[in-house]
Structure formats: structure tokens, C-alpha cells
């Protein structure tokens, strides 16, 4: 299945010069959505994953069903102030400024095997920050999986030696 057929590309969004890859059309297509979840699940099935960790918001769309498929728990990573209990946080750079991601402090136990799942890998800043949160709590990042990868932005380079996979690659 060619997932690009199910991903809407919007030039000039959110600003001029950007070509936005919209996965909402993919999740509307039940075959493409199931295929995406199944393929990521197949990639992770032999990695003994305890937990899937996914950043808000679109990471939840793929991370939670993958966790269910492989029999793992699911941990949401949220923007600052959205989680009710004690958290750990990491600040990361955006194109214009900074943002903060948080995870509950008790979300991961030392030694748990974690896969990070998100809709898109661009510069790698978000996923690198999520990996730092996982490792700060003693988890081991065993894979980072994406539906879409924007290869020209070299996000994989920022992820170092992490085992990564993506279902669709675009040159921006």
C-alpha cells in the first residue's frame, strides 16, 4: 500500500515555504490507518517493548493503537501544565522559541523497554526530547517509529544511535 495516496499535502501551511503533510486524511482511510498501525506493530513485535510513549497530539493517534496491538502500555507526553500529577519535563527548541514537554514522574520504571511513536519525524527535536524524558526516568529507548519522515531535514541525525523506522519518506 502506498500511504502517500492517503496523506494530504498542503503547500504554504502553516506558513509560506512549508509543505504540510496532513495525516488526518490517512486516519480517515480505515485501510491506510490499519496498515500504518499494523506495520509499526510488526516492526516492534520482537523488540520486547513494555511501553509505547507518544507526544501529543498526533502521536497519540498512532501510539495508542500500536500499544494495544503489541500488548504494551501507553504513556502520553504532554505540553506543560496538561498532566495532573508530579512530572519530569524537558525544554526544547522550536523554529521560533521554546516549548516544554512533560511526562508523569511515575510513568516509567527503571529498565523498562520503550518505543517512541509519532506521526512525523522532521528535525528530530521533539523525539529527541521525548527520549531524554524516557531516559531520565530510567527507561531504555529501543526504537522510534514514524508514519512520515521528512528526510531533507535530517531528523534521524539528531536521534543518534536510536533504532528508527518510518513508513513514508518525503524530500521537502
UniProtKB/Swiss-Prot annotation:
Pfam families: Pribosyltran. Its main location: cytoplasm. GO terms for molecular function: adenine binding; adenine phosphoribosyltransferase activity; AMP binding. It catalyses: AMP + diphosphate = 5-phospho-alpha-D-ribose 1-diphosphate + adenine. One of its GO terms (biological process) is purine ribonucleoside salvage. It is found in: Cytoplasm. SUPFAM superfamilies: PRTase-like. GO terms for cellular component: cytoplasm. Keywords: Cytoplasm, Glycosyltransferase, Purine salvage, Transferase. Its EC number is 2.4.2.7. Pathway: Purine metabolism; AMP biosynthesis via salvage pathway; AMP from adenine: step 1/1. Gene3D superfamilies: 3.40.50.2020. InterPro entries: Ade_phspho_trans, PRibTrfase_dom, PRTase-like, UPRTase/APRTase. Homodimer. Catalyzes a salvage reaction resulting in the formation of AMP, that is energically less costly than de novo synthesis. PANTHER family: ADENINE PHOSPHORIBOSYLTRANSFERASE. Belongs to the purine/pyrimidine phosphoribosyltransferase family. This is Adenine phosphoribosyltransferase.
